[in-house]
Amino acid sequence: MASAPQPTLPLFYNDLMPLNSRDHGKFRTKQIDDAGFLKNQHAVPLTVDEFVQAQRNFPIVFSSGDQPLPLCLMGLNEGVNTYVDDQGKVNEPVYIPAYIRRYPFMLAKLRPDADELSLCFDPTQ
């Protein structure tokens, strides 16, 4: 018997867990000093609102397909990010897209048929 297909997680995310006060009431956040999750990522999604700031540091390209998505290009070869070194440090001061800044948090539906979104996080980070 076949199982239901597993939903694909968004870029960077290994797992998503809903944040709740009972289990995570004592959690604290800290600034991420290691951008190792970016090392092998050559393109990152952008919003239109970010174009002015992002274009100062990155070329902006659009994905192909039925619903093109704006991307900031962080490297010319797939799997190579020229802005992040092997230790996960950003090489120079550049604009960091909102998609990266929000990680490890994300608003997500807990059920496909749900209308409301829950604040989730990647517990592997």
Stretches with model-predicted labels:
Residues 1-72:
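Short, extreme N-terminal leader segments that mark the start of a protein/domain
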Residues 63-125:
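Aromatic- and glycine-enriched beta-alpha-beta binding-site module
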